[in-house]
Amino acid sequence: MNQQKSLTLIVALTTSYGIGRSNSLPWKLKKEISYFKRVTSFVPTFDSFESMNVVLMGRKTWESIPLQFRPLKGRINVVITRNESLDLGNGIHSAKSLDHALELLYRTYGSESSVQINRIFVIGGAQLYKAAMDHPKLDRIMATIIYKDIHCDVFFPLKFRDKEWSSVWKKEKHSDLESWVGTKVPHGKINEDGFDYEFEMWTRDL
């Protein structure tokens, strides 16, 4: 694994930056879940070796995933936790911190490994998002913006869409989002179960 590989954060959040309530998502959007799976699973087919993406998550995020969907299939799952006795099952990596997780990936999926890493995604929760936003390798946010005022008790740590951060974070064109994702993505607002939401991609220079 190339130690210069960047990090991508993927998150669904309200316009007031709410991301959760009572250790779960306060919305259930099947199309958004499908988008998350496509984005975090996509690997270019022209690679001559087997490649996989990584999903990094905190313990609470891991535990919030229904048992039948754990681990997230077709992706390398890494759980950030200080609980060394946590039983994650075979093939699931654990690490004490974001940097420790990256070191583990460098060691495990080096040039001699039969599996190479394509992209590294940070998928939550709030504490890991904060660590990722502070990390020098984080250069991309795949954001699902939910246009509904929903009560949340957990919030994203940085208001990257606000004017005060416009010199750092830039919203990319939809065509660039599709190019990066590798497939067609609905443009503009989507309505599902009374929720309007939209897919965006934001980047910053490293």
From Swiss-Prot:
Gene Ontology CC terms: mitochondrion
Task performed by this protein: Key enzyme in folate metabolism. Catalyzes an essential reaction for de novo glycine and purine synthesis, and for DNA precursor synthesis.
Residues covered by the DHFR domain: 6-204
Listed name of the protein: Dihydrofolate reductase
Chain positions recorded as substrate binding sites: E32, I33, S34, Y35, F36, K37, R75
EC code: 1.5.1.3
Amino acids binding NADP(+): 12, 18-24, 59-61, 81-83, 124-131
GO MF term list: dihydrofolate reductase activity; NADP binding
One matching Pfam family: DHFR_1
Annotated catalysed reactions: (6S)-5,6,7,8-tetrahydrofolate + NADP(+) = 7,8-dihydrofolate + NADPH + H(+)
Pathway: Cofactor biosynthesis; tetrahydrofolate biosynthesis; 5,6,7,8-tetrahydrofolate from 7,8-dihydrofolate: step 1/1
Key words of the record: NADP, One-carbon metabolism, Oxidoreductase
Record-stated family: Belongs to the dihydrofolate reductase family.
GO biological process, one term: dihydrofolate metabolic process
